[in-house]
From Swiss-Prot:
Protein name: [Arg8]-vasotocin receptor
A GO term from the CC aspect: plasma membrane
Keyword Translocase part of the UniProt annotation: no
Record topology, Cytoplasmic segments: 49-67, 120-141, 213-257, 317-434
One Gene Ontology molecular-function label: vasopressin receptor activity
One BP annotation, GO: cellular response to hormone stimulus
Its job: Binds to vasotocin. Produces an induction of membrane chloride currents indicating that it is coupled to the inositol phosphate/calcium pathway.
Major localization listed first in the record, in broad terms: membrane
Membrane topology recorded in Swiss-Prot or TrEMBL: Multi-pass membrane protein
Amino acid sequence: MGRIANQTTASNDTDPFGRNEEVAKMEITVLSVTFFVAVIGNLSVLLAMHNTKKKSSRMHLFIKHLSLADMVVAFFQVLPQLCWEITFRFYGPDFLCRIVKHLQVLGMFASTYMMVMMTLDRYIAICHPLKTLQQPTQRAYIMIGSTWLCSLLLSTPQYFIFSLSEIQNGSYVYDCWGHFIEPWGIRAYITWITVGIFLIPVIILMICYGFICHSIWKNIKCKTMRGTRNTKDGMIGKVSVSSVTIISRAKLRTVKMTLVIVLAYIVCWAPFFIVQMWSVWDENFSWDDSENAAVTLSALLASLNSCCNPWIYMLFSGHLLYDFLRCFPCCKKPRNMLQKEDSDSSIRRNTLLTKLAAGRMTNDGFGSWRDPCNSRKSSQSIGLDCFCKSSQCLEHDCSRKSSQCIPLDCSRKSSQCIPLDCSRKSSQCMSKES
């Protein structure tokens, strides 16, 4: 993986039969560690997701397929490159050379664009939450299926570019090299790979996270304005679709996880593509030992990306690590610690939701619900944020026999209202969309 393509039209100023053995040993060591860490990490994630008792979500689906894409990278990019470095030359038939080169680029496309689709899903969940109610699982499967199909098609040209050929006429030494009829062919190929696998995805990711950050900032601003107005006139702010209370802690955690995955991708792959572009666009570039070391180091850094992702999943999703440890009876103590942390987190989350619900009610019965943000988007409402023409209340087993019901602004003609689990003397109830 030191070079995306070995062009047969390159100059042969250096000895084509030799190599720097010290650099080769370093490559073999790093690639071996990378392969085993990537396989163990991604298998752990897949095993944890298979054994989890939690309901599968869209995010779990994307994580699962991103792990599968990283497994493709490990077995069909890192492993062949490791064998290649051990043998120095490619020892195999021509069709195997073409297949290996195809699968190497297939893994790169699949892993990259699966990450892009996962980011797009987070963008929809944060910036357009109502769209997540419209067959979200079906949309996720379409996004994942299209990613695999496009990756397969975009990597197909490898079959026509690479073949088993002599590294020098009359040398009788063969290797799996790329053939370019025109001198500019190698430049076009490297530029296409760089744009398709790195530049376009990075631009899409930056745009998505720009909108996500703007949406979160806007909602924080709305929450601050609502809190200030509530303090002044005692009114209760309306809970809008774009409210901070709707952007749950779980969604924000998945956004953070996706952002870390994106940053790890950029850090690992940026040096590799920079060096590759430098090698084909700089006419003074030569493949001597010093520059070969730079190419090698950048390629090794790129290969580390496939073994970073599973540990990022484990870090941001505690239950995956717990579900993985459930497979090993000897890990009972750390498993219990993770279970306790997850339980404490659930208690804190439920307590926070109870306080938020109680904070929306006025003590004297009916409260006014208003939205401090004047934007049309923030005025859209679901569930709690509405005034109904009529509502029905169900009595709750509280200290008082009657329960007070807050009328809500619904788009429907009627809604059913159920009381909260009250600890106060009077019970208050919130609407439930019928």
